Amino acid sequence: MYIEQHSRYQNKANNIQLEYDDRQFHTTVIKDVLLWIEHNLDQSLLLDDVANKAGYTKWYFQRLFKKVTGVTLASYIRARRLTKAAVELRLTKKTILEIALKYQFDSQQSFTRRFKYIFKVTPSYYRRNKLWELEAMH
């Protein structure tokens, strides 16, 4: 009886350890992917490419990314691109169109629409304004 009970507890403990190891591994994979994304924000980042980089199918990677980060891959990439664009608006003399195209927006109009949605002001107003909108930055 004692051996049986001990064996069940040992199995549960082993399963918990395996789940923990699995979570740790997935978190490490996602951290590596986040770093890779950060260095490639000015490139086309298709779900297939990012999932392949991680070594998963796109379906599994989407679920894993959301589980680990709390946001979808597309939302994360868009937020990071907009934040980088906001910094460039302040620190460079590049045109809004140049910045929009650099960060993979189809047009200045689509960039302005997304930028205004996140930062609550247009890119041109943001560039002229002296205060940094840190709350909207991701």
Curated annotation (Swiss-Prot):
SMART domains from the UniProt entry: HTH_ARAC (SM00342)
Keywords recorded for this protein, A-Z: DNA-binding, Transcription, Transcription regulation, Transposable element
One Pfam family recorded for the sequence: HTH_18
Residues of the HTH araC/xylS-type domain: 31-129
PROSITE patterns tied to this protein: HTH_ARAC_FAMILY_1 (PS00041), HTH_ARAC_FAMILY_2 (PS01124)
Top-level division of the source organism's lineage: Bacteria
Gene3D superfamilies on file: Homeodomain-like
GO molecular function, one term: DNA-binding transcription factor activity
DNA-binding region, residues: 48-69, 96-119
Full protein name: Transposon Tn10 TetD protein
